[in-house]
Amino acid sequence: MPESTNTIINSSVKKIKLSALCELCHGRKAVMKRPKNLMKLCKECFYNIFETEIHNTIISNDLFYRGEKIAIGASGGKDSTVLASILKTLNERYDYGLNLVLLSIDEGIKGYRDDSLATVKRNQKQYDMPLEIVSYKDLYNWSMDEIVACAGIRSSCTYCGVLRRQALDRGAEKLGIKHVVTGHNADDVAETVLMNLLRGDVARLESSTNIMTTSAGSPIKRSKPFKYTYQKEIVLYAHYKKLDYFSTECTYAPEAFRGTARELLKSLESIRPSCIMDIIYSGEHLVLAPKKQKRKTVAYKNKNKNKKKSNSEQEEQEKQEQEVNPDGSISLNRNGIKKDGNTCEKCGYLSSNKICKACMLLNGLEINRAKVTIDNNSAIDGAAKLTKKLEQLSF
């Protein structure tokens, strides 16, 4: 073969090899295109960028302080598994000085949560972290399978969302922890922004886009270190690191409104890859400027019309002043209904209202319990499937 021909072949091979190299280190073979910016990276460079970005998010938002005890909301899924792995790595690498604990919620979904908890228990040994499991059955005397059998599958996420948030708070309080971190990622935040906009619930944008939030009346704060991290990158990190996680979707998730928002987000992302971050930034800027507004009652307005009233009468009317919170709830003083920091009259847990949301939902279930006959555990096991089939029938 002529020398010139060999030169052409060798140069073309060299070009192919150069195009397959990592765009960051230019020394190792690229194994992926980063979803966030389509950059070709090798595994080592991807690990470094992924971990460094999360470290920068933690530092820039002052999420933790030295010596703080942190509960990691662990479900066994990819997000919480990667979160536990990353926090352990960063805690050791940058000497955060954190005391990390795994906190899991057992909703009582047979064939799903029992398998995922087995993954969490393996993670406990792998990461050498304490594990606390809190169950719906112990806290509320209801499992999610029983709730679905009573209320229907379409209401499952409404009940589970409220009960899970309170269960996380109670589990953290039991451990003496004031800070819970969750694996909510950029896709989750963008989906929540879309859901709130589609429902016309602009008041909830602040809590859905904040990296750190608290529940009304609760001293437990929650943070999202993965707020700016794409779900695809979390999956890639778990895959290349060969992390042990549970990948099955919740039995009741397909019926949730979030699934509709997720499909919409995927369609938008296929057209504009940056739409996830764009939606998050839009949600942050769409937050209502006044965090709290004063809404005057009729009695309070009448006070200004009659200036001859005594000071004592005026003070009495001021007690009727209502404060509207960002989430749309109303906090009254002790002579009204409730004030932030008080407790639910039924369960005794912290609540800004007379009766907490969890107790209101559970009370409705108790009323309907008599209408549902559950013979044994096997009937409960198939309750979700039976309910789903019945709801698909048309008469």
From Swiss-Prot:
Q: Which GO terms describe its biological process?
A: protein urmylation; tRNA thio-modification; tRNA wobble position uridine thiolation; tRNA wobble uridine modification
Question: According to its UniProt entry, what is the function of this protein?
Answer: Plays a central role in 2-thiolation of mcm(5)S(2)U at tRNA wobble positions of tRNA(Lys), tRNA(Glu) and tRNA(Gln). Directly binds tRNAs and probably acts by catalyzing adenylation of tRNAs, an intermediate required for 2-thiolation. It is unclear whether it acts as a sulfurtransferase that transfers sulfur from thiocarboxylated URM1 onto the uridine of tRNAs at wobble position. Prior mcm(5) tRNA modification by the elongator complex is required for 2-thiolation. May also be involved in protein urmylation.
Q: Which InterPro entries match?
A: CTU1-like_ATP-bd, CTU1_C, Ncs6/Tuc1/Ctu1, Rossmann-like_a/b/a_fold, TilS/TtcA_N, tRNA_thiolation_TtcA_Ctu1, UPF0021_CS
Q: What is this protein called?
A: Cytoplasmic tRNA 2-thiolation protein 1
Query: What GO cellular-component annotations does this UniProt entry give?
Result: cytosol; cytosolic tRNA wobble base thiouridylase complex
HAMAP family named among the record's database cross-references: CTU1
Q: List the PANTHER family.
A: ATPASES OF THE PP SUPERFAMILY-RELATED, CYTOPLASMIC TRNA 2-THIOLATION PROTEIN 1
Pathway stated in the Swiss-Prot or TrEMBL entry: tRNA modification; 5-methoxycarbonylmethyl-2-thiouridine-tRNA biosynthesis
In its UniProt record, a GO molecular function of this protein is: tRNA-uridine 2-sulfurtransferase activity
Tell me the superkingdom of the source.
Answer: Eukaryota
Asked if the keyword Nucleotide-binding belongs to this entry, the reply reads: no
Tell me its family: Belongs to the TtcA family. CTU1/NCS6/ATPBD3 subfamily.
Q: Where is this region: Disordered?
A: 297-335
Task: Return the EC number.
Answer: 2.7.7.-
**Residue ranges, compositional bias (Basic residues):** 297-309
Q: Which UniProt keywords apply?
A: Cytoplasm, RNA-binding, Transferase, tRNA processing, tRNA-binding
In which compartments does the protein localize? Cytoplasm
Gene that produces this protein: NCS6
